[in-house]
Regions:
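N-terminal secretory signal peptides that target proteins for export/translocation
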Residues: 1-15
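Bacterial N-terminal signal peptides
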Residues: 18-31
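A structural boundary/capping signal
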Residues: 2, 33-231
Length: 231
């Protein structure tokens, strides 16, 4: 499933339930790492905008980053997945932002103390970049998640690839443990992306250059820079 290529026509068909603008919302530029983040600024903004509880969470986030830099990759994945899954609540954009689809920065996500699957995935992605994991080993993956026997819903997870053609390990806000994709038969990959490109299904060949498009993702990056996280 995770290595099966899909056609461009199939991609368009799968995207219809998620909204016409969602593909553009994914294709933007992101640097290969988060360079020299100013987490002092991020922490100050958390206190100013959201209060002491948010600032305390940023302090804990910074501690996680500092203490995890030298760990093996598997431990980094587990600690980052656990940190956000335990500290942040899942809630819809309609409730949090009064919008149908809003992609939050890590600061906004921490500040509100809640977010949806995109927000969890983005925060984990950014954190793992800061921990030194290469962008070529990370992809945000849009999937159809099966609920029950027949119903599927749009969902996003983060995938870690030990090697570009390997089976990914999946970080999911709905699952406490990091599991290989082969153990997530409830997820059907539609496409995945990072700064280097866009992949359809579980394919290994990029179909697009994300640096050529504008999107919500670009807006997230702009807001991240203003908040002390410089891509």
């Amino acid at each position: 499933m995770w290595n099966a290529a899909m056609t461009r026509q199939g991609l368009r068909a799968c995207l219809v339930p998620w909204g016409r603008g969602c593909l553009l919302a994914l294709l933007v530029a992101l640097g290969a790492s988060v360079a020299a983040p100013d987490l002092d600024k991020t922490q100050a903004l958390a206190l100013q905008r959201y209060g002491s509880r948010a600032a305390e969470t940023v302090v804990a986030w910074r501690r996680l980053i500092e203490e995890s830099r030298a760990l093996p990759d598997a431990d980094k994945l587990d600690k980052v997945n656990t940190f956000f899954n335990r500290r942040i609540l899942f809630e819809s954009d309609a409730v949090i932002w009064q919008q149908e689809d809003y992609w939050a920065t890590p600061l906004e996500f921490i500040g509100r103390g809640a977010g949806d699957c995109e927000d969890f995935s983005i925060a984990k992605y950014v954190t793992l970049l800061m921990l030194g994991i290469g962008n070529d080993r990370l992809r945000l993956i849009y999937v159809r998640a099966r609920i029950g026997s027949t119903t599927t819903v749009a969902h996003m997870v983060l995938g870690f690839y030990p090697q570009p053609t390997d089976e990914p390990l999946i970080l999911d806000n709905l699952i406490s443990s990091v599991r290989p994709a082969s153990m997530r038969s409830d997820l059907a990959p539609v496409f995945s992306f990072n700064s280097a490109g866009l992949w359809v299904g579980g394919g290994t060949s990029s179909l697009a250059d994300p640096t050529t498009r504008l999107s919500r993702w670009r807006d997230v990056l702009d807001r991240m820079r203003q908040e002390g996280l410089s891509p």
